[in-house]
């Protein structure tokens, strides 16, 4: 595969979100922009995926998840050597300074409050994907 062919492969974004409506909205938005999407609905499934799957281009990660929360999942991402550079954007309805600081301290690259504005979220995704290119 040459550089031109590699550039045409759509970036894969991992969504870890337990709210079905939000995950469907995220998938729709991202697929319309040409991204490939993998969705997992709970922290246990995400931990297994992080341990065994190839790295995505970016992770959109809910904070409050069943079984394992988003803060712990960020730590798992940062512990896996081949995933360390993957940008992690945390999504949450919790709008407190404490949660923002906790997410950033855990290793998240960005923190987005729900309900989010679609264009803003897409701009953040593009910024993080471009920064990692």
For each feature predicted by the language model, list its residue ranges.
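Non-catalytic signal-transmission and effector/linker regions of two-component phosphorelay proteins
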Residues: 1-14, 119-133
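The feature encodes the CheY-like receiver
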Residues: 66, 84, 96, 114-115
């Amino acid at each position: 595969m040459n550089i031109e062919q590699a550039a045409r492969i759509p970036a894969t974004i991992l969504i870890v979100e337990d709210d079905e409506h939000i995950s469907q909205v995220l998938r729709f938005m991202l697929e319309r922009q040409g991204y490939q999407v993998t969705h997992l609905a709970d922290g246990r499934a995400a931990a297994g995926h992080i341990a065994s799957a190839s790295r995505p281009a970016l992770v959109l990660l809910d904070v409050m998840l069943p079984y394992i929360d988003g803060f712990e999942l960020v730590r798992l991402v940062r512990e896996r050597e081949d995933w360390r550079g993957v940008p992690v954007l945390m999504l949450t309805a919790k709008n407190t300074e404490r949660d923002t600081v906790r997410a950033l301290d855990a290793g998240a690259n960005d923190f987005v409050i729900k309900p989010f504005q679609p264009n803003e979220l897409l701009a953040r995704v593009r910024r993080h994907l471009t920064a990692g290119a």
